[in-house]
Amino acid sequence: MTEKKKLFVLCVALFCFMAVSAQQRMSVSSPDGKLRFSLKVTSESVSYDIDYRKQPLITNSLLGFSFDSGEFGRNLKAGKVQRKKIDETYKLIVGKTSSVRSRCNEMTVPMQEPSDSGRLINLVVRAFDDGIAFRYEFPEQKAWDSYVMYDERTQFNLQGNPMALLMYLPGYVNTHEGVYSHVRYDKVARKRLIEMPATFEFDNGVAVAITEAAIRDYAGMYLMKEKGGLTGKLSPKLGQEKIKVEIDNFPHRTPWRVISVADRVGGLLETNILTSLNEPCRIEDTSWIKPCRTTFTWWNGNVVPDSTFSP
């Protein structure tokens, strides 16, 4: 090999090494090892993949935000990853079972802008045997203690062409009622709001449902198919078009973004992942809560004194 060829090979190897070293990769798997969430942080973007039984379900899906203080999602550096195992049991007041065992592996990834005064957001990921969930945490920090959010850019780029069961909505202000469509993923209409949960069944029988949990002090999320796949769309504040969320002080947490996974569609009904992610019941004494019949004022008129509902 000539000196020029040696130099060329060395330069190519060095370039490849620099490209790989510029990427930060980390992952977390479910207790049974079947589900895996993989995160990739580069100078250009933050993205994730989800594999089930070593087969890709969701790939190259971008994460990020648009704030009044600027975009968050580029030129980030991942800090030291914190991991823990969660294994707890809790009682359900209502539901499919009286007692639930919740097991998952958790990974927390600090993501910060380069400067010492750069904004910091933690990505918290939980891998259950029956799903993946992730949320963002805004810890207390000197240079940033509030925000006005214009958008949360969370993508769900499904692989293949599964059957989709979903409901289109006319707008952010709606009754959450309508006719469901059962179509192939490539036939899902673009630029139309989609209610959550949205369900997808792959040809091998694996089923996925995309939804959210633990919504507090935050906008509700819908889905919309755009170029590259599904993107989360936050409902604007009342009377606003641009502003989605305003937070006056930290710490703060977003809702969980939940991808429930099962070997068959029926398995999605059997999961308790949403109650495991929601906050515990705040009612100390629940003995008075019993099965009963109820009625709703928006069906039968203003039967409640001083009600603001109209028949």
Segments predicted by a language model, with ranges:
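Bacterial Sec-dependent N-terminal signal peptides
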Residues: M1-R25
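Intrinsically disordered, low-complexity regulatory segments enriched
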Residues: C11, V261, V303-V304
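Structural motif
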Residues: R257, R293-T294
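Substrate-binding cleft of carbohydrate-active enzyme catalytic domains
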Residues: T294-P311
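Phosphate/adenylate-binding glycine loop and adjacent helical scaffold
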Residues: K290
